[in-house]
């Protein structure tokens, strides 16, 4: 099916291309109209999916095809007819599918077939009601019948040859010159020499020439067609031109008749289409145009006669179509019956073969059963003989066993008498052993109680020894603590005494300096008194300021004395608090030891408890040691806090001592130094409070923001003695002349401060080492 469609579409496509390239405009338009009719029919059948959809296009649509066709290049749409449209066409269903080894039709046959196919399609559109609804039967059953396929093949081949012969007979006398001389129409030349047979042609290869070469000008054809007396004018305006009359010689007569029916106003529009068989068997004179041109009345009579003839032909065609469809239905029914019969025969053959195989298996089974029955009979006889022998053996064994039992009963009575005598003796011995065991058990219980008492005494002694050791350790620790605290207290007292002595010396030195300054101020006042009345007010203001300065200095000295007194009280309270903390720590350790001592001790009777005793003892020792270490850590923390507090307060005293190092401007310098000292003291207190409670760092360096003192106490490496190092520098500066006091303070202050800081850090580290 696909091969025939491709071949017909390819031939029509080549013909249109060559006509567009070499032919005239009228022939090109006609071929394009044929192609568009074929494409429109294929598109209608492929779009709706039913044969009736392709037949609903009316005759006026076919009459406008020649006017709408224009010259265009081939767009590749010639193959879009679809297999559905070809399967719906009756002529294609009658046409067989060529096999791979079959020869394709020739160029002229394909051309005539395509023209007739387009004309048949255009003519079969109005006749919708004449189609049988069973015409769309699937072609699967028809393709299975090879005889029917060969018959249709021959019928279609004879039909195409008949159409070609009719066209040659009609057009042979008109254009004999150019048709016979064309190399592309070899069959036309052969048809002029002799008529072609009705039967199918041979299957051998046919000679084919090159593609047709159409002339560029058809003037000779036009003149020949005009002078030909057989051409007569038609009633339709499309047949008034010479090009159309020339094209009539190349188009099959059926196509011309269909075109003529479109312009005749007859009520036979819906008559059935012309059957190819009727066309093939009709007289040739009925398909040609009228030979003589006459008046309109003669043309009307000719048209009516022609219409009557066509009606008879169409009725015959419809009858043949009905007969053909009936025969097709009968053939399909007979083929179905034959298929059923063949299936029944196959089933019967299969059943017979199964029956034969079943008979063979049943015979084999019977023979096998017979052999097995014989074997079973022999086996049963053998087993019966064996059973008889076993029964005889059993009877002889029973007789032998009865004789043996009688002998055994006589011997067993003697043995029972002997065993009774032996059992009586053994019972007496057992009672004696039980009495001895009871005595031994009582002795063992007494020994066990004695051992428990000894173990309890040993445990009590060990616990008392451990308690004594713990108390001894605690007392030793208390003694060491007391010794350390006494040493620290002696050092604190010595430091306090030295500090009081230093304060006394500083106070006396400051009083002397104050007296010297007052004397100097009086001298300057007397010298400046003779200067005039203007200096009187300045002298009064200076005297007033000096009095205020003296009062402030006295207040500062009183505050310093109060501060030293409160510091001493604070240190004493701190020491008392430390003693209270140590007492609390020792009380907690003692409470833990008493809890451990009064805890229930396991009995050492079992070996497992004896193995656990050393482990428990070691565990208790470790706990007591950890508690002692914890108490020592608390003591050291308290000492470190005391030292930190001292280091925090010593810079304050140093700043108080350096409140008046200068003599020229004492009030301003004292205010600045006092502010810096208090800021340093506050920052050092914040840093100390921010440290965690469990901090075990032995000493802290003084904060960088705190001002370093101009005089402080520093001692030797053992911390026993303390001297005043930088104070000598200060006294030297104070003993010098008043004019050089400021220079002494500014030049000697920096190295003295550095040395004081170094000695203070060394003092603190030595003190911490001694206390720890």
UniProtKB/Swiss-Prot annotation:
PTMs per UniProt: Phosphorylation at Tyr-107 is necessary for efficient binding to SRC and synergistically functioning with SRC to activate the downstream MAPK pathway. Monoubiquitinated at Lys-343 and Lys-404 by Crumbs complex-bound WWP1. De-ubiquitinated at Lys-343 and Lys-404 by USP9X; the interaction may be promoted by cell contact inhibition. Deubiquitination of AMOTL2 negatively regulates Hippo signaling activation.
- Which portions of this protein are annotated as coiled-coil regions? 305-578
**InterPro entries in the cross-refs:** Angiomotin, Angiomotin-like, Angiomotin_C
The GO terms this record gives for MF are: actin filament binding; identical protein binding; protein-containing complex binding
Give the position(s) of the covalent cross-link described as Glycyl lysine isopeptide (Lys-Gly) (interchain with G-Cter in ubiquitin): 343, 404
Subcellular location per UniProt equals:
Recycling endosome; Cytoplasm; Cell projection, Podosome; Cell junction
Q: Where is this site: Required for interaction with YAP1 and ubiquitination at K-343 and K-404?
A: 214
Give the record's keywords alphabetically: Cell junction, Cell projection, Coiled coil, Cytoplasm, Endosome, Isopeptide bond, Phosphoprotein, Ubl conjugation, Wnt signaling pathway
Cite the residue spans of the region called Required for interaction with CDH5.
101-303
Q: Where is this motif: PDZ-binding?
A: 769-772
The entry summarizes the disruption phenotype as follows: Knockout blastocysts show loss of radial actin fibers, a 60% increase in cell area and size of trophectoderm cells of the late stage blastocysts. Loss of hexagonal shape of trophectoderm cells, instead cells present with an uneven pentagonal shape. Significant reduction in the number of blastocysts that successfully hatch from the zona pellucida. Endothelial cell conditional knockouts show no difference in litter size and progeny are viable.
Modification type Phosphoserine: residues: 752, 755
Which residues are recorded as modified (Phosphotyrosine)? 107
Result for mutant: residue 107 to A: Abolishes interaction with MAGI1 and ACTB. No effect on interaction with CDH5
Basic and acidic residues bias locations: 80-91, 100-112, 142-153, 686-699
Compositional bias ranges of the Polar residues kind: 178-191, 718-733
State the residue spans of region: Required for interaction with CDH1: 221-303
Q: Which GO terms describe its biological process?
A: endothelial cell morphogenesis; negative regulation of transcription by RNA polymerase II; positive regulation of protein localization; Wnt signaling pathway
Which residues of this protein are annotated with the site description Required for interaction with MAGI1 and ACTB? 107
Tissues in which the protein is found:
Expressed in skeletal muscle at neuromuscular junctions (at protein level).
Q: Gene Ontology terms, cellular component aspect?
A: apical plasma membrane; bicellular tight junction; cell junction; cell projection; cytoplasm; cytoplasmic vesicle; podosome; recycling endosome
Subunit annotation: Part of a complex composed of AMOTL2, MAGI1 and CDH5, within the complex AMOTL2 acts as a scaffold protein for the interaction of MAGI1 with CDH5. The complex is required for coupling actin fibers to cell junctions in endothelial cells. Within the complex AMOTL2 (via its N-terminus) interacts with CDH5. Interacts (via N-terminus) with MAGI1. Interacts (via N-terminus) with ACTB; the interaction facilitates binding of cell junction complexes to actin fibers in endothelial cells. Interacts with CDH1; the interaction may facilitate binding of radial actin fibers to cell junction complexes.
Give the protein family: Belongs to the angiomotin family.
What name is this protein filed under?
Angiomotin-like protein 2
Organism, by scientific name, is Mus musculus
Which gene is the coding source of this polypeptide chain? Amotl2
């Amino acid at each position: 099916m696909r091969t025939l469609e491709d071949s017909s579409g390819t031939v029509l496509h080549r013909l249109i291309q060559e006509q567009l390239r070499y032919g005239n405009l009228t022939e090109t338009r006609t071929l394009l109209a044929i192609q568009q009719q074929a494409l429109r029919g294929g598109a209608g059948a492929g779009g709706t999916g039913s044969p009736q959809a392709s037949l609903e296009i009316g005759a006026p649509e076919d009459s406008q095809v020649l006017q709408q066709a224009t010259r265009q290049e081939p767009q590749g749409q010639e193959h879009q007819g679809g297999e559905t449209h070809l399967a719906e066409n009756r002529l294609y269903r009658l046409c067989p599918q060529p096999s791979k080894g079959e020869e394709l039709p020739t160029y002229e046959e394909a051309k005539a077939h395509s023209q007739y196919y387009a004309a048949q399609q255009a003519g079969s559109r109005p006749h919708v009601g004449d189609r049988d609804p069973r015409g769309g039967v699937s072609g699967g059953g028809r393709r299975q019948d090879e005889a029917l396929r060969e018959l249709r093949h021959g019928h279609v081949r004879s039909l195409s040859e008949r159409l070609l012969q009719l066209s040659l007979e009609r057009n042979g006398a008109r254009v004999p010159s150019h048709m016979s001389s064309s190399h592309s129409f070899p069959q036309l030349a052969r048809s002029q020499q002799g008529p072609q047979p009705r039967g199918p042609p041979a299957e051998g290869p046919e000679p084919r020439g090159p593609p047709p070469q159409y002339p560029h000008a058809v003037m000779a054809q036009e003149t020949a067609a005009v002078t030909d007396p057989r051409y007569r004018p038609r009633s339709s305006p499309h047949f008034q031109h010479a090009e159309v009359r020339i094209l009539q010689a190349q188009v099959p007569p059926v196509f011309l008749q269909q075109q003529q029916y479109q312009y005749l106003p007859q009520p036979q529009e819906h008559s059935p289409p012309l059957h190819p068989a009727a066309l093939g068997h009709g007289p040739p004179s009925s398909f040609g145009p009228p030979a003589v041109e006459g008046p309109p009345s003669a043309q009307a009579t000719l048209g009516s006669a022609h219409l009557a003839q066509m009606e008879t032909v169409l009725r015959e065609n419809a009858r043949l179509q009905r007969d053909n469809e009936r025969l097709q239905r009968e053939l399909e029914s007979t083929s179905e019956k034959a298929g059923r019969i063949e299936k029944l025969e196959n089933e019967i053959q299969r059943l017979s073969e199964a029956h034969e195989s079943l008979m063979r298996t049943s015979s084999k089974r019977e023979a096998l059963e017979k052999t097995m029955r014989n074997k079973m009979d022999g086996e049963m006889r053998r087993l019966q003989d064996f059973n008889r022998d076993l029964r005889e053996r059993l009877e002889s064994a029973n007789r032998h066993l009865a004789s043996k039992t009688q002998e055994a009963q006589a011997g067993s009575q003697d043995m029972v008498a002997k065993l009774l005598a032996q059992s009586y003796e053994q019972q007496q011995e057992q009672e004696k052993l039980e009495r001895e065991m009871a005595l031994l058990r009582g002795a063992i219980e007494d020994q066990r109680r004695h051992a428990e008492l000894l173990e309890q005494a040993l445990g009590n002694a060990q616990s008392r020894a451990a308690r004594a050791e713990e108390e001894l350790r605690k007392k030793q620790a208390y003694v060491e603590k007391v010794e350390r605290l006494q040493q620290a207290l002696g050092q604190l007292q010595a430091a306090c005494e030295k500090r009081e002595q230093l304060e006394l010396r500083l106070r006396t030195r400051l009083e002397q300096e104050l007296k010297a300054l007052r004397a100097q101020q009086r001298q300057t006042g007397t010298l400046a008194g003779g200067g005039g009345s203007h200096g009187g007010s300045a002298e009064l203001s200076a005297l007033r300021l000096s009095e205020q300065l003296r009062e402030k200095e006295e207040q500062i000295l009183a505050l310093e004395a109060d501060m030293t007194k409160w510091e001493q009280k604070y240190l004493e309270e701190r020491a008392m608090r430390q003693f209270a903390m140590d007492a609390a720590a020792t009380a907690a350790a003692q409470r833990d030891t008493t809890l451990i001592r009064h805890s229930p001790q396991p009995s050492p009777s079992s070996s497992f408890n004896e193995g656990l005793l050393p482990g428990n003892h070691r565990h208790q020792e470790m706990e007591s040691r950890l508690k002692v270490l914890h108490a020592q850590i608390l003591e050291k923390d308290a000492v470190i806090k005391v030292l930190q507090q001292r280091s925090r307060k010593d810079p304050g005293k140093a700043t108080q001592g350096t409140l008046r190092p200068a003599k020229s401007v004492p009030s301003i310098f004292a205010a600045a130094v006092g502010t810096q000292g208090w800021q340093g003291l506050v920052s050092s207190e914040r840093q100390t409070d921010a440290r965690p409670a469990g901090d075990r760092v032995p000493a802290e360096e003084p904060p960088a923001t705190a001002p370093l003192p101009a005089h402080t106490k520093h001692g030797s490496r053992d911390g026993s003695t303390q001297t005043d190092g930088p104070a000598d520098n200060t006294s030297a500066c104070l003993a010098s002349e008043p004019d050089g006091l400021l220079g002494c303070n500014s030049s000697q202050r920096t190295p003295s401060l550095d040395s004081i800081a170094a000695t203070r850090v060394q003092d603190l580290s030595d003190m911490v080492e001694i206390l720890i």
